[in-house]
């Protein structure tokens, strides 16, 4: 992670007196956000309503909160309950010339984005990426038989109508200094919390929030998929590599398992090259699963990645199913009366 990025994070997530210098700009940003929201609610900007229930999973802050693991959990959960979920995503980190793009487990992450390839591999669901969420959703419906749509991110993309909004919160960093950009990390004011359907906290929740706990799984060799329990790395010095929104979370989880790591943080969606991981020694390299999809093309024998699974309370799943049933009935009534 660059010194500039680290400086910005310290500024946003600590009580820096100098933040007041940017407060007027944050006020203008917040005003623009409210005007835009008002324009959508008044019909000045068009919201596209899809014929199937739409769940949007997003956050209020810049940076990683754990959306992708939750999307994976939701896709697997819904399939277990008889649904056929389809996914759309922005495709961050991808550089395709044309969008929308369908994503498959063997797609090139440099074209469609690292998170998209990870989602395709972990869920097995049809997936389309593109900056235009509406166009991506129509492309998904044209090439799949999904009966529920999950939008990875897109909470602020009001052009796409949604039936359920799930907000993900970092349980440690929360909302930083609670200021909107650029004085703070917020994309929208904290009042937005009152309008979402469910709040999931990655870590310790507060009142009314559902706890999501993550657990690192056995390491997998990046070349052949060989499994190795993480405890087998305890007597070895390791390189920890993370190009995610909050690299320190990954490093802290490794340290909590009594692993000795030299951390190597990189920006989110970083386009890894072989020289980035050309360390002087031959000690094992442990990276996130998201980073592994980009590093496999130049992988060495000492490269391992660490999958992560999350757990949520049964009450959260029950709430999701209840909201989905309500959304489906509402759409059926609209079709019947229309």
Swiss-Prot record:
Stated role: Transfers the gamma-phosphate of ATP to the 4'-position of a tetraacyldisaccharide 1-phosphate intermediate (termed DS-1-P) to form tetraacyldisaccharide 1,4'-bis-phosphate (lipid IVA).
Protein name, UniProt field: Tetraacyldisaccharide 4'-kinase
Catalytic activity: a lipid A disaccharide + ATP = a lipid IVA + ADP + H(+)
One Pfam family matching this protein: LpxK
Pathway membership: Glycolipid biosynthesis; lipid IV(A) biosynthesis; lipid IV(A) from (3R)-3-hydroxytetradecanoyl-[acyl-carrier-protein] and UDP-N-acetyl-alpha-D-glucosamine: step 6/6
HAMAP family for this protein: LpxK
Annotated organism of origin: Nitrosococcus oceani (strain ATCC 19707 / BCRC 17464 / JCM 30415 / NCIMB 11848 / C-107)
Enzyme class: transferase
